[in-house]
Regions:
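Single-stranded RNA-binding regions, centering on S1/OB-family and related RNA-binding modules
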Residues: 564-566, 573-713
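Extended amphipathic alpha-helical scaffolds
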Residues: 1-48, 232-380, 564-578, 586, ...
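Long, charged amphipathic helices and adjacent flexible linkers at domain junctions
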Residues: 234-241, 543-569, 617-637
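Glycine-rich, flexible beta-strand/loop modules in the N-terminal catalytic cores of phosphate-handling
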Residues: 16, 28-113, 118-125, 184, ...
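Conserved phosphate/anionic-ligand binding catalytic regions in large, soluble enzymes, centered on
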Residues: 30-32, 40, 125-143, 341-364, ...
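Short, hydrophobic beta-strand segments
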Residues: 116-118, 188-193, 234-238, 249-260, ...
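Flexible, glycine/charged-enriched surface loops at secondary-structure junctions
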Residues: 106-112, 147-149, 216-234, 287-297, ...
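Mobile "lid/hinge" segments at catalytic clefts and subdomain interfaces of large enzymes
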Residues: 143-262, 460-557
Length: 713
C-alpha cells in the first residue's frame, strides 16, 4: 500500500516548487522531497533522543550530496564512485547550515543531522536554495525546537529585472548573483558574487528576496500544521544563576579592567587570573553542591561557559554605552595596516597583508592552460582557470595543531576570497594563463578571509596579471541589545566576531562590490541596519584600498623571469589529429623534445607554455613542420638531402621534399649539379609546380631578392 502523502506548492520566479512528505525515509524525524522542473532533492532530518554529554556547542551536522546519476553520468576516477565531498558540495552544506544554526535555543545539545541528496538535476533550476528550503521543511516536521522556518532565494538581475531563482544561464548573464535566507520578518544570511554592483543594488535584491522568503515561511507553517507536528518545547534544565553570581562577585571588576586595558596580552593574562579565582571559588563549594553535580552529569565546563558570557556582557556594554571597543578603537575605525610585495624570491608574485594582529602571505603562481582545474561535477561549468586556496595553520593562533587538508571553514574562506577577485581578472583571451593563489594565515585575530582577499589582489598585481583594478575587503560586526540602537563595527577582530551578533564581509573596488557574505548570530537584521552596515563597509574598504596603494598601484609591467612564457599559433582544424598523432604519440614527442606544455583547442589555436624561449621555438618548429603544406609560389628554406644526375632533392619540412631540376639551379646552363649544390647545403627554393601525384618541383634560380626579403621578414 502506497503511504499517504502531504504536499504544498509554491510559485518562485515563475516556476512551481513542490514539497512532499510521507512516502520516503519513514525512519527519519522529518523527510521531504523538493522539486522544481526536473531538479529534485531528498532532504532528511534525524534528531537524537538524548543530548550529547560533554560538549559545549550545538551538534548540528549538514551534508549535501550530489549524485552524478542526477545528470545521467557515471563518476570518473578508478572506482567510478562519488568519493569525498567536492568543494561545491561543502559550500552548499555551509549555505544550509548558516541560516539554521542561529535558530536553536541556547543550551540545546541534541545531535541533529540533515542530509540533502540531489537525485535529479536539469542543469537549469539550481539545487542549493531548494536544499535550504528542504532542510527547513524537514526540521519543521521533526518536532525539534527549531525557531524557524526559514526561506531561501537566489536573486539575479537580467535586463534590468530582478529574477528569483534564475537558471544557470540567467545567472551567468547577470552582474548580481545573491542568495538570501531569513525568517518571515528578518534576514539571517546573505551570500553574493557580483560584478561591481552598488550598495543600493544589494539592498534592492535583499528586499525583493524577502517577499519570496515570506511566502516560503508561511507555506511551511501551514504544512507543519497539516502534518500534525508537535514541536518540542525546550527549557534549559540547568540553572546556572548561582554560578553567574559567583563570577559577578569574584571576577566582574577584573573582567571590566581587562577589557578597559587595550593591550591584548595584558587582557588575556588578567582574564586567566580572574577565571582561576572563579574556579577556586567553585572548587571550594561542598562536594554535593548543585554546580558540581551538573558539571559531572553533563561533562560541560559551565564555569568556562558562564565566564565567557560575563566577558560578552562587559565587552558589549563597552561598545553600546561607551562607544569603545576591546582594543580602544571607535566603531568605524580600521586597525593599522602595513603591506609589502615581492617577498618570496622565486614566486611569480607575492604579497604580505597585515591588519592589526592578522597577517596573510599570498603567493600567485602562473601556468599554462593545461593546468586549469577540470571540474567533474553536476554543474554546467567544466573548468576553472583561477583558483584560490586558503590555509589556516594552528601556529597562526599560537596553538599546536597537526597540519591536515582543508576543512569546511577553509574551503568557505578560500571560495569567498576567490569570488572577490574573479571580476577583476582579465579574460583568457587577454591573458591565457592559469592562475593559482595560496593565502597562508601567518597570524590570526579576525578577518582572515578579508586579509586573503587583499593579499591575493596585491600578489596578482605583483605577478604582472593585468587585473582591471585592486580589490579590498573588510569584515563588519554588530552589537545589539533590546531597546538600544545597534552598533555596527568596522574591521572586527576575533573577540568581536566570537562575542558579537554579526559577521558581515564585503569586498570590492572603489566603485562597487564583488562579493559579500553575511551571517547573523542574532535572529536576523533589520533592513535599515543592513543598509547602514553596507555604507560603513564602503568607507572601511576605501580606507583599506588606500593603504594597499601605498605599496602597489598597478600590475607589474613584466612577468617574473621565473614565470613560464606563453605563445600561440593557429593550425588548420583538419591538422589537429596530425599534431596529436595516434594515441597522442606525436604530441608527446613534441613535449619531450621541447620541454614545453602544449594545449590544442578545437578551434585550432595552439598554446605553447615554456620556461624558456628555446623550448617554445622547438615546439613551434615541430608543429609547423607537421602541418606544413607547400603551395605553388611558396618560398622555403630547405636542406639538400640527395643528388641525382638530373637534379637535387631538397627537404622542405613536415616529411616532405621536392626536386630542383638541373636546369633550375643556375641562370646559366650547367653540366653537373656539383659543385654548385652539395648534400647538406641550406638553399632557398620556390615551389613552381605540384603535379597530380603530389610531386613538388622547385627552383633555385627563380628566387628573387624580393622573395628572399619576404622569407627573412
Amino acid at each position: 500500500m502506497v503511504p499517504e502523502t502531504k504536499s504544498f506548492q509554491l510559485e518562485i520566479g515563475g516556476k512551481t516548487v513542490t514539497v512532499e512528505t510521507g512516502k520516503y525515509a519513514q525512519s527519519t524525524n522529518g523527510s521531504v522531497t523538493v522539486r522544481c522542473g526536473d531538479t529534485m532533492l531528498f532532504v532528511h532530518c534525524v534528531v537524537s533522543k538524548e543530548p550529547r554529554v560533554g560538549i559545549d556547542f550545538f551538534p548540528l551536522l549538514i551534508d549535501y550530496e550530489e549524485r552524478m546519476s542526477s545528470i545521467g553520468r557515471i563518476p570518473g576516477g578508478y572506482n567510478r564512485s562519488e568519493g569525498k565531498a567536492s568543494d561545491k558540495a561543502i559550500l552548499v552544506s555551509r549555505l544550509i547550515d548558516r541560516p539554521i544554526r542561529p535558530l536553536f535555543p541556547k543550551g540545546y545539545r541534541n545531535d541533529i543531522q540533515i542530509v540533502a541528496q540531489l537525485f535529479s538535476y536539469d542543469q537549469q533550476n539550481q539545487p542549493d536554495t531548494l536544499a535550504m528550503l528542504g532542510a527547513s521543511c524537514a526540521l519543521m516536521l521533526s518536532g525539534a525546537p527549531f525557531e524557524g522556518p526559514i526561506g531561501a532565494v537566489r536573486v539575479s538581475k537580467v535586463d534590468g529585472q530582478l529574477i528569483a531563482n534564475p537558471t544557470h544561464q540567467q545567472a551567468d548573464k547577470s552582474d548580481l548573483d545573491i542568495v538570501v535566507a531569513g525568517t518571515h520578518d528578518s534576514v539571517i544570511m546573505v551570500e553574493a558574487g557580483c560584478k561591481f554592483v552598488t550598495e543600493d543594488d544589494i539592498m534592492e535584491a535583499v528586499e525583493f528576496a524577502q517577499g519570496e522568503i515570506r511566502k516560503q515561511c508561511e507555506a511551511q507553517v501551514e504544512f507543519a500544521k497539516a502534518c500534525g507536528v508537535v514541536k518540542e518545547e525546550f527549557v534549559n534544565p540547568y540553572d546556572t544563576t548561582e554560578l553567574k553570581n559567583i563570577i559577578n562577585e569574584v571576577a566582574h571588576d577584573m573582567i571590566f579592567d581587562a577589557y578597559h586595558n587595550f593591550d591584548r596580552k595584558y587582557r588575556q593574562e588578567k582574564l586567566e587570573e580572574a577565571k582561576k579565582l572563579v574556579k577556586e571559588k567553585v572548587e571550594a563549594l561542598p562536594e554535593d553542591h548543585y554546580i558540581h553535580k551538573i558539571i559531572e552529569e553533563t561533562g560541560i565546563d559551565f564555569v568556562a561557559e558562564e565566564f565567557k558570557a560575563a566577558e560578552k556582557k562587559i565587552m558589549r556594554a563597552m561598545i553600546l554605552d561607551e562607544g569603545v571597543r576591546a582594543d580602544g578603537r571607535k566603531p568605524t575605525e580600521v586597525r593599522p595596516i602595513w603591506c609589502e610585495v615581492g617577498v618570496i624570491p622565486r614566486a611569480h608574485g607575492s604579497a604580505v597583508f597585515t591588519r592589526g594582529q592578522t597577517q596573510i602571505l599570498s603567493v600567485a603562481t602562473l601556468a599554462g592552460p593545461g593546468m586549469k582545474q577540470e571540474l567533474d561535477g553536476v554543474d554546467p561549468e567544466t573548468e576553472k582557470t583561477y583558483m584560490h586556496k586558503y590555509i589556516f595553520p594552528g601556529f597562526s593562533v599560537g596553538e599546536v595543531k597537526p597540519l591536515r587538508g582543508p576543512g569546511r571553514r577553509e574551503v568557505g574562506h578560500g571560495n569567498l576570497a576567490e569570488r572577490a577577485n574573479v571580476p577583476a581578472l582579465p579574460s583568457q583571451e587577454e591573458f591565457g594563463y592559469t592562475i593559482r593563489v595560496t593565502s597562508d594565515v601567518l597570524e590570526s585575530n579576525g578577518s582572515t578571509s578579508m586579509g586573503s582577499t587583499c593579499g591575493s589582489s596585491m600578489a596578482l598585481m605583483n605577478a604582472g596579471v593585468p587585473v582591471k583594478c585592486m580589490i579590498g575587503g573588510v569584515a563588519m560586526g554588530m552589537i545589539t541589545e533590546e531597546g538600544k540602537e545597534p552598533v555596527v563595527l568596522t574591521d572586527i577582530q576575533g573577540i568581536e566576531d566570537f562575542l558579537g551578533d554579526m559577521d558581515f564581509k564585503v569586498t570590492g573596488n572603489d566603485d562597487g562590490i564583488t562579493a559579500l557574505q553575511m551571517d547573523m548570530k542574532a535572529k536576523g537584521i533589520a533592513n535599515d541596519t543592513l543598509r547602514r552596515a553596507l555604507a560603513q563597509a564602503k568607507e572601511g574598504r576605501l580606507h583599506i584600498l588606500g593603504e594597499m596603494r601605498k605599496v602597489i598601484t598597478e600590475p607589474a609591467k613584466q612577468l617574473s623571469p621565473f614565470a613560464p612564457s606563453i605563445s600561440t599559433m593557429t593550425i588548420p582544424t583538419e591538422d589537429i589529429g596530425t599534431v596529436i598523432g595516434p594515441g597522442g604519440k606525436q604530441i608527446r614527442a613534441i613535449i619531450d623534445a621541447s620541454g614545453a606544455e602544449i594545449d590544442i583547442q578545437d578551434s585550432g589555436v595552439v598554446t605553447i607554455t615554456s620556461n624558456d624561449q628555446e623550448g617554445a621555438a622547438i615546439a613551434k618548429k615541430m608543429i609547423k613542420d607537421l602541418t606544413f603544406k607547400p603551395e605553388v609560389g611558396m618560398v622555403i628554406k630547405g636542406k639538400v638531402v640527395r643528388i641525382i644526375p638530373i637534379g637535387a632533392f631538397v627537404e622542405l619540412g613536415g616529411g616532405k621534399d621536392g626536386m630542383v631540376h638541373i636546369s633550375q639551379i643556375c641562370q646559366e646552363r650547367i653540366e653537373t649539379i656539383e659543385p654548385h649544390v652539395n648534400i647538406g647545403d641550406e638553399v632557398i627554393v620556390k615551389v613552381i609546380k605540384i603535379d597530380d601525384k603530389g610531386r613538388i618541383n622547385l627552383t633555385i634560380k627563380g628566387v628573387t631578392e624580393e622573395d628572399k626579403a619576404k622569407l627573412n621578414a
